């Protein structure tokens, strides 16, 4: 893959979307609203735990994982939501993983993919997702707003992902309630946890904020805990010898 990761991924997504048909809408899976949960549980740093077999930056992470057992361990140890990679080409995920996990857990599930079209949103909802990901860097603002409004009209919540101040301002402008700050640059795939710390000075009162990527230890989590409602963690949990212990380590008590 070229150095410019995001354009390469989006080119592939356009090919995939061209092959998708718009599915008939199935009933929305019932669970709590992530936004409400994060707003009312601010005494500790909440964990969005990710099921991820591989990534462009890490290569294969854990190909043999029992995805349902992994997800249940997350839930049993207090995860606020489970993020499921559904991208096949770059992350070795699958929409079927989302379906399997969503039938076995009661907490919200996030469809983690590069979404550029309504067909992907309906497919994710039908597979059991209650939250979808929209990436500011992947979409023009007007299209981002269209997809955001489409998803929320279907009863879904949306995690709007940002990486810099102009993107954060876009998320605020479109009225995003759940905003992610990705510590990973999607062009280079390099990470820097200071991205979260720097952008936190521009946060507003209404949204909830999630720090994503580059969080491996309790020490990392403690750095962002004063400023964020939650963290999204994948690799650290997928490679942990003791998953339950790792989840607990990252759940920083905020009093």
Curated annotation (Swiss-Prot):
The transmembrane segments are none
Checking SUPFAM superfamilies in the record gives: Ribulose-phoshate binding barrel
| Leader sequence residues | none
Query: Please, which domain of life does this record's source organism belong to?
Result: Bacteria
The EC code for this enzyme is 4.1.1.48
Q: Which reaction does it catalyse?
A: 1-(2-carboxyphenylamino)-1-deoxy-D-ribulose 5-phosphate + H(+) = (1S,2R)-1-C-(indol-3-yl)glycerol 3-phosphate + CO2 + H2O
Q: Name one Pfam family in it.
A: IGPS
Gene Ontology MF: a single term: phosphoribosylanthranilate isomerase activity
The EC class name is lyase
Q: Which GO terms describe its biological process?
A: L-tryptophan biosynthetic process
S-S pairs? none
Q: What pathway annotation does it carry?
A: Amino-acid biosynthesis; L-tryptophan biosynthesis; L-tryptophan from chorismate: step 4/5
Could you tell me the keywords of this UniProt record?
Amino-acid biosynthesis, Aromatic amino acid biosynthesis, Decarboxylase, Lyase, Tryptophan biosynthesis
Q: Which HAMAP family match?
A: IGPS_B
In the record, the note on similarity to other proteins reads: Belongs to the TrpC family.
Spell out the NCBIfam families in the cross-references.
PRK00278.1-3, PRK00278.2-4
Q: Which PANTHER family does its entry note?
A: INDOLE-3-GLYCEROL-PHOSPHATE SYNTHASE, TRYPTOPHAN BIOSYNTHESIS PROTEIN
Output this protein's name: Indole-3-glycerol phosphate synthase
The source organism is: Streptococcus thermophilus (strain CNRZ 1066)
Q: Corresponding gene?
A: trpC
